[in-house]
Amino acid sequence: MTVVGEAYLPLGDRDFTATVQRILDSGADCVLNTVNGTSNLGLFTALAAAKVDPAKLPVFSTSIAEDELRSLVPEQVRGHYALSCYFQSLATSANRRWIAGFRDEFGFDRVTGDPMEPDWCLVHLWKQAVEKAGSFETEAVRQAFRDGLSYAGPGGTVRLDPKTQHTTKFFRIGRIRGDRQFDIVHASEAPLDPDPYPQIAFPGWSVDWTTDGITRGPEVTIDGDV
């Protein structure tokens, strides 16, 4: 895989006309979209205006979930993709029960999504640690974390890694549907281990909360067009 270009725009920017033209001129086969928040509306509006066909130039977004799709135009995003650990359309009994309970509490029109599901799991992992420690004190709870707790969540069973204090996660790719939901087109066979400081991005950095915590390497800089 070759990266043929990259661009960084201010958070909240809505004008992506020039950026989309650069994408088209680059000859890219796909787009990795790390845009956040309302800027996604500007990006997909510009893509639609340029008549970008997701079958020929798909966009893979890292921060679009079901709730974000409620504010986007279905015709502009249908056929593009999201990279995520959880989708509401996951067809498991645990997920269906969770969605039903969520809708009973907040209404049938509300949706679940990836930003929400790990929070649910983490609260339950913290609860396990508190019960195991028999205390709310921070150090006692951290000590309980060292036993490698796990929780069967809506997106699958996750395990807390004592060294990083991050959890294992499934990886999934979803294709956006016209009803603002996702068809899951790929899923990892097993949960992936956490890697909060990948060496390609954080050379020399590491973390081990069972010993010395975070080991810092060189300060990270971003090279690219602004």
Predicted regions and their residues:
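Extracytosolic ligand-binding ectodomains
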Residues: 1-226
